[in-house]
Amino acid sequence: MQTRNAFSYIKEEITRSISVLLVIYIIIRAPISNAYPIFAQQGYENPREATGRIVCANCHLANKPVDIEVPQTVLPDTVFEAVVRIPYDMQVKQVLANGKRGALNVGAVLILPEGFELAPTDRISPEIKEKMGNLSFQSYRPTKKNILVVGPVPGQKYSEITFPILSPDPATNRDVNFLKYPIYVGGNRGRGQIYPDGSKSNNNVYNATTSGIINKIIRKDKGGYEITIVDASDGREVIDIIPPGPELLVSEGESIKLDQPLTSNPNVGGFGQGDAEIVLQDPLRVQGLLFFLASIIFAQIFLVLKKKQFEKVQLSEMNF
């Protein structure tokens, strides 16, 4: 009986320990996951809205350029490069989550036509692998292999990202035709201003939540500020919390208005989107074009030879 109770007690303790460890893991792991742009895709079934806007712009509010380079035409079942460039000043530093300054990271989303997908590793040439570096690409959804995401990765090393793409073959995929297709791209540099849950990051401007007089500013030990504002209308005290990172622009005793910036804008990054076009070319059409061009060349050569032969005949008749 005592042995059975001992085993029961041990079983309960093991179960309780596992539960505690699982809860601790979830608590610690969740903020880290939410910090990565790739996890924001859980909120959107498709990264490109009906208006053409890519949803990454909901978190990265500043508008910045992005460029994409793809071949004009590709043949079926071939691997080609889609090069995405995310330019920015390599000298600038961004505000990190802890308020310190650090290098910018970059990320990108590539929306390909249906049927196009990430090339298998065994189909990628050594030249393309060298350009790819150590990047790891993922599908936006398991069912959407034509939408690829990457990042965040160090911007100083990967401001130019090479995607290895495999073109579809209409002979094996009846949903694909030999047509001109659009390709859409979105690229960001630096941290966003809004988290996926809608809360503001410290990479943001913080404004006054009321108008009045700044009564007190407390600098916190771990960084950031606690600003007490005496409301001008009823005299009540309103406390605005500023996280570590943004620089304070106001001082005690200063009169401020509603929505007046209390801090500078620390954001040095931003998001941009662009597009390109690619033609999935029919090999038979290419062969037909080559045959047509070759026939024209041979016809021209034949005419030149005939002309010279005619001139020789005329010259011989004149001499006769």
Swiss-Prot record:
PROSITE patterns of this UniProt entry? CYTF
* SUPFAM superfamilies attached to this UniProt entry: Cytochrome f subunit of the cytochrome b6f complex, transmembrane anchor, Cytochrome f, large domain, Rudiment single hybrid motif
Q: What residue ranges are annotated as transmembrane?
A: 286-305
Keywords recorded for this protein, A-Z:
Chloroplast, Electron transport, Heme, Iron, Membrane, Metal-binding, Photosynthesis, Plastid, Signal, Thylakoid, Transmembrane, Transmembrane helix, Transport
Q: Which InterPro entries does the UniProt record give?
A: Cyt-f_TM, Cyt_f, Cyt_f_lg_dom, Cyt_f_lg_dom_sf, Rudment_hybrid_motif
The record ties this protein, via Gene3D superfamilies, to: 2.40.50.100, Cytochrome f large domain (2.60.40.830), Single helix bin (1.20.5.700)
Q: How does it sit in the membrane?
A: Single-pass membrane protein
Name the coenzymes or cofactors required.
heme
Gene Ontology terms for molecular function: electron transfer activity; heme binding; iron ion binding
One GO term of the cellular component aspect?
chloroplast thylakoid membrane
Q: Which family does it belong to?
A: Belongs to the cytochrome f family.
Q: How does it assemble?
A: The 4 large subunits of the cytochrome b6-f complex are cytochrome b6, subunit IV (17 kDa polypeptide, petD), cytochrome f and the Rieske protein, while the 4 small subunits are PetG, PetL, PetM and PetN. The complex functions as a dimer.
Please give the function described in this protein's UniProt entry.
Component of the cytochrome b6-f complex, which mediates electron transfer between photosystem II (PSII) and photosystem I (PSI), cyclic electron flow around PSI, and state transitions.
The protein's name in its UniProt record: Cytochrome f
UniProt organism field:
Lotus japonicus
